[in-house]
A protein has these predicted regions:
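Acidic-enriched catalytic cores of C-N bond-cleaving enzymes acting on peptides and small amides
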Residues: 155-157, 162, 170-181, 186-195, ...
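A generic structural motif
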Residues: 24, 107, 202-208, 295
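Structural signal for hydrophobic packing residues in well-ordered secondary-structure cores
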Residues: 18, 40, 44-48, 124, ...
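Acidic/His- and Gly-rich active-site-bordering loop/insert found
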Residues: 1-106, 125-132
Length: 309
């Protein structure tokens, strides 16, 4: 019962953070971030009063002093992405229903942000002093590319972290067949990221005489070809191989154990045996996310583009 009460208290606290709309809208959202900071100061008074604190625009950095000047950085972010489409419960309601907490940011990543602050709050309440300085970095522009203000400050202060802990994977029930329990999927590596603008040019004109080979259809054909072609081979990093080895050791299913071991050891045919989600995790993904053409429905553009993430 005590654990259930505590879980519900945490859920209500996260709900309050979700109820503050922190979608990043340049030049128009500082008031919302200030509201979130006020909620957090109420929820985590020891952190806000007992730690050194810096504010960079709406990004926050705290330092919980330790016994040595070695540094651990716990990273998260306050902003969330837009919430379009139909939602079962309003995205900024923080509704607790059906045994779940609903809302934009519940997973990405106000739950994580809350948990970092809550852990430090409870440790401070218990009188604990960390071995290292613990920095809590909570940015406000992660979803839109981010700034480097916190990094610049740490560099200027000569602070070189011994360890960075960022948002990672989840705790999953039964990650492999034959395993009875939950597994924390700890992320120890991260893929790079790039946005590419792909442009097609051609003769424009009026939609009444469209012609052939105009920019938008060519871009459509290009996107279909990219989507249906394996442009980048799947490679197994040392971290990924170790993950598959450990998952194999956990499985009580002999066939699943052999399958996971074959991947870990890169035996012949291992790449062909991967499912789509595994390929996405291990390989380079390509997603077309934005597009642009003419500004009128009856005008064929001379130039059109798509953004490839």
């Amino acid at each position: 019962m005590e654990n259930q009460d505590r879980a519900m208290r945490y859920a209500r606290q996260i709900a309050r953070m979700i109820q503050v709309d922190t979608v990043r809208r340049p030049g128009a959202d500082k008031e919302n971030f200030d509201r979130l900071h006020a909620v957090m100061a109420e929820l985590f008074p020891r952190v806000f009063e007992g730690c050194r604190r810096w504010e960079f625009e709406s990004s926050l950095l705290f330092c919980w002093p330790g016994k040595t000047r070695r540094a651990l950085v716990l990273m998260s972010h306050q902003d969330v992405v837009e919430a379009p489409g139909a939602w079962k419960y309003p995205p900024f309601s923080g509704t607790i229903a059906e045994g779940k907490l609903w809302g934009r940011g519940a997973l990405d990543v106000k739950g994580n942000l809350h948990d970092i602050f809550q852990a430090v709050e409870e440790l401070m309440e218990a009188g604990y002093t960390p071995e290292w300085d613990v920095y809590i970095a909570a940015s406000h522009e992660e979803e839109t590319g981010g700034n480097t203000l916190i990094v610049d400050f740490l560099r200027e202060q000569g602070i070189v972290p011994e360890m960075l802990v960022d948002e990672g994977s989840s705790i999953q029930p039964c990650p492999v067949p034959g395993f009875d329990g939950h597994a924390a999927m700890v992320s120890v590596a991260e893929k790079g990221y790039i946005d590419v603008k792909c442009v097609a040019r051609g003769p424009g004109g009026h939609a009444s005489i469209p012609g052939k080979g105009t920019p938008l259809p060519r871009l459509g054909a290009f996107m279909c070809e990219v989507e249906n072609t394996d442009l980048f081979p799947v490679r197994l990093s040392s971290a990924s191989a170790e993950m598959y080895r450990r998952m194999a050791a956990l499985s009580a299913d002999e066939g699943e154990r052999a399958y996971l071991t074959a991947i870990a050891e890169e035996r012949p045919g291992w790449q062909e045996s991967l499912g789509e989600r595994q390929k996405e995790m291990l390989g380079t993904t390509i997603a077309f996310t934005m597009a642009g053409g003419s500004q009128a429905a009856n005008v064929i553009p001379q130039e059109a583009y798509v953004i490839c993430n």
